Amino acid sequence: MAINGNSIPAIKDNTIGPWKLGETLGLGSTGKVQLARNGSTGQEAAVKVISKAVFNTGNVSGTSIVGSTTPDALPYGIEREIIIMKLLNHPNVLRLYDVWETNTDLYLVLEYAEKGELFNLLVERGPLPEHEAIRFFRQIIIGVSYCHALGIVHRDLKPENLLLDHKYNIKIADFGMAALETEGKLLETSCGSPHYAAPEIVSGIPYQGFASDVWSCGVILFALLTGRLPFDEEDGNIRTLLLKVQKGEFEMPSDDEISREAQDLIRKILTVDPERRIKTRDILKHPLLQKYPSIRDSKSIRGLPREDTYLTPLSESNSSIDATILQNLVILWHGRDPEGIKEKLREPGANAEKTLYALLYRFKCDTQKELIKQQQVKKRQSISSVSVSPSKKVSTTPQRRRNRESLISVTSSRKKPISFNKFTASSASSSNLTTPGSSKRLSKNFSSKKKLSTIVNQSSPTPASRNKRASVINVEKNQKRASIFSTTKKNKRSSRSIKRMSLIPSMKRESVTTKLMSTYAKLAEDDDWEYIEKETKRTSSNFATLIDEIFEYEKYEQIRKEKEELERKVREAKAREELERRRRKQEEKERARKLLEKEDLKRKQEELKKQIEIDISDLEQELSKHKEEKLDGNIRSISAPMENEEKNINHLEVDIDNILRRRNFSLQTRPVSRLDPGIMFSSPTEEVSPVEPKRTENERLTTEKKILETIRRSKFLGSSFNIDKELKLSKMEYPSIIAPQRLSEERVVSDSNDGYESLILPKDGNGVSQLKDSTATTAPVSDGRLRKISEIRVPQFTRKSRHFSESNKRLSVLSMYSTKESFTNLVDILKNGNLDVNNQQSQRIPTPRSADDSEFLFETVNEEAEYTGNSSNDERLYDVGDSTIKDKSALKLNFADRFNGSNEAKQTDNLHLPILPPLNGDNELRKQNSQEGDQAHPKIKSMIPESGSSSHTEKEEENEEKEEKKPEQHKQEEDQEKREKVVDDMEPPLNKSVQKIREKNAGSQAKDHSKDHLKEHKQDKNTAIGNGSFFRKFSKSSDKTMELYAKISAKQLFNGLEKLLRGWTQYGLKNIKSHPNNLTLTGKLSSDNIFSLRSTLFEVNIYPRGKMSVVQFKKVSGSFKAVKKLVNEVENVLNKEGVLQK
């Protein structure tokens, strides 16, 4: 029995909790190490007994921690040892089972290592074979690397602190001098044995703890291979020894003694400069260790944490701080602000908070994994226990389980935790209880006096090694811990029992580990010694709470979950109440709003009603006043009849009809001619009824239909003008009148042309003929006026054709359908009566400008006069039949009409000029008899060039040459050409028209090679491009480039242009991409640019030209006009900068 200095027995029957103390394994300056055995499971352990008097005197060496000058540091070195050893969980690190205390001593229950110290093995055997020495050395390095990854430095590595278990595996022990490598500070404590100490330690300068442990491992490797130390003095002169260590002077063994790989590794480890010294992870990769591989050690290496775990512990938890671990750190730092700890965890560099967080997090994960494994083992054993023989005396009955107070089951596995259950003192002493995880050495003779270590270490107590390591599981939650061994329950004063350190004075707390006293001096001055005699207790409740929460995780986790669930329910209830309150408030607002709207609507209705009444009264007054004025006016001439307002209205309608009739007849009183395809005339045998004075409603609708058709033909509204819609609107004005008959597709010629005899012109005949003037007078029309075609007034929106002289000033849609050969001065015909056809043909006016250029539809008269010569609107206006094409579908004057309607056509013997699509939806024209026209008349040359001719190709080549030579001359025409595209799937033209010859500069001649070029050009296309059309043709312009020459280098110009174009992104440039390798820039001019240009993709290439450079602008797609504008802007900038070569 151990007796303390005050002669107060602290241990009853030589037991400490469930552990019965046995023989002493070693003695040290701070205490001794005793062998212990669990009374219930038979598990062996080494108990390190430390006197509390050491803490009061402050003689514990190595108690200084890095950063201990800060208020956040842990107060005692022994606390550091408890926390670190409890949290470390590695096969090559000695395990701490539990901690107990009395009023005089502190008991650390450690893992028991049967084979003792490595030092004893070296003394007995001497130098070890290289493969065996490397096996020990590798396990040492793995354990040290594990500690370093968690920011822990041992600082006292030597063979005396390296223990061996029953399988001769290394167990690193004695963390009494361990320190946290934190806050980036250097350790300043000179500790460790001088033979194994690093040069920076013996020199007394601040040192890096990681490097010093590596030096100690190098000395141990030297001793394992040679059986001696590299730094030693036979005479024991410490001063000479320290000088050798400072200089790193030692004698390297020869090749006969150790291998070259071993020499290389020792040389790299025993390097004086700690910065150049090899690291632990690099040692594991050294050829010497790779020379002797081990499967078990390889698994341990793979399970090592990251080297910088202590620097970035949050990376393992997804950068979110665990609330449980944070609360533990708050307790560990004695109620420190959690926000301050969070800032420490997130700031760069190493600190104590990060190290302990990493340790706590790994311990929590390992505990959860082991708990799951143990539960699975229990399930399997519960199933297998059914088949156990009744003769086996295993106390597993429920009655005996209810009587237990503290049964500890230590598993044989080093990682399986200890199980704590309740049991009574009598049952503990009488029952032979075993659990599934109990040790296999239950039959070991505990009374044996066999010593496991004959070497006494005077510097520090060396605990014996454990057989198996165990970790902690939770205690039953609804039971309170009582005295473990008690002789009687009535006499508590004489019991002298030992309480667990986790107990608080209320005896409602329980723990599976211990906490040392926070203020031992206060206990020494306490007068209530009876209380101290009666029981030992924990005095640092904060630290006790920390230990309980860490190592009884499941119990406190359940409490936390219940608390969180309660808080969640409270929050949900509050949220529901708040939601209900908001809903009621919203409903009240909605009701108030509806009430206000209802009142406002009622008020507005009343105001509107009053206003209507006022307006009605005003109108009545005005009406009465108007009647009075009318009566006053009639008084002057009583005999005169009163004016009939209805009659005036009828007169007005008649005048409107006359105007419409005049316009309609102006289109039909012209002589029979092929100039105007809009005029349809019947055969000579048809008789036309005269116009009645009063037109019916159907005739009025017919007239409106013809007017709308003429407007559409004028190309002013085009296909966008919906004629049927307009007719429907006109019919709505007269809903009672319904047209009884369908309008005729052919137009009826009025009797104003009765003086002439209508001629049926052949299909290919010229649009001129000698007129017969038998009467020389025209018939009167219904309104009594004479009608002539010269009296027609055509609106100015139509274009002016330059094929006619200034004298007649013919501004009519007819000119768009005319040809040079078919031109006839109709005014002269009407005035002179006859006109010689041959003379007329000989007097045709040549085309002053090419009809191959484009022209917009909606231009003013002046603009048309300026650009009509180059306009492409003089192209094919209508097609004349060809002998090779007979059954073509009707011509569709509108571009969109070509793709609509049926292709059926009626056969007729008479030739009718082309007409627009009729209003009844039939979009085809009558087919024409081509054979008769081919024999009677030659083909008429059209004003539109044929798309397949070689002359057309010449025009395109000439236009491209003009664009290159004079880019600013035809700027508008180029922009239009860029916008035009070819519709490949258009229907073929009805008739092939003769090419229109362009004469420029007094007779330029067509080139022969252009025809060859045309043939090659045709082969590259799938469909014909030049389909005859009333509209302009769309063609895709070829890619063209423009170049500028600069005086600077290509690279400098490339950088300048890249910055310039990127600076213009706010003005419409987008997607500027640079390719420095080939000096190319690409980009896009968006449609919303400041110049209102089309969206265009362009490419800029820069080529070196000696010391100068050439920049080439290329249009990828879009408008070449936009590219030209961009080139002009870039040219202006380069000219201002003075880098443009002129």
Swiss-Prot record:
Low complexity bias locations: 382-395, 425-440
Domain spans labelled Protein kinase: 19-289
Catalysed reactions listed for this entry: L-seryl-[protein] + ATP = O-phospho-L-seryl-[protein] + ADP + H(+); L-threonyl-[protein] + ATP = O-phospho-L-threonyl-[protein] + ADP + H(+)
Signal sequence residues: none
EC number: 2.7.11.1
Chain positions covered by the region annotation Disordered: 378-412, 425-469, 676-698, 903-1031
Residue numbers annotated as active site: D156 (proton acceptor)
Comp. bias regions, Polar residues: 454-465
SMART domains membership: S_TKc
Phosphoserine sites (modified residues): S406, S465, S471, S617, S689, S719, S805, S807, S883, S930
CDD domains from the UniProt entry: Kcc4p_like_C
GO aspect biological process, one term: septum digestion after cytokinesis
Residues recorded with modification Phosphothreonine: T884
Subcellular location: Cytoplasm; Bud neck
Keyword Cytoplasm: yes
Binding site for ATP: L25, G26, L27, G28, S29, T30, G31, K32, V33, K48
Purpose: Serine/threonine-protein kinase which regulates the localization and the function of the septins during mitosis. Phosphorylates SHS1.
Protein family per UniProt: Belongs to the protein kinase superfamily. CAMK Ser/Thr protein kinase family. NIM1 subfamily.
Protein name per its UniProtKB record: Serine/threonine-protein kinase GIN4
Organism from which the protein derives: Saccharomyces cerevisiae (strain ATCC 204508 / S288c)
Lineage of producing organism: Eukaryota, Fungi, Dikarya, Ascomycota, Saccharomycotina
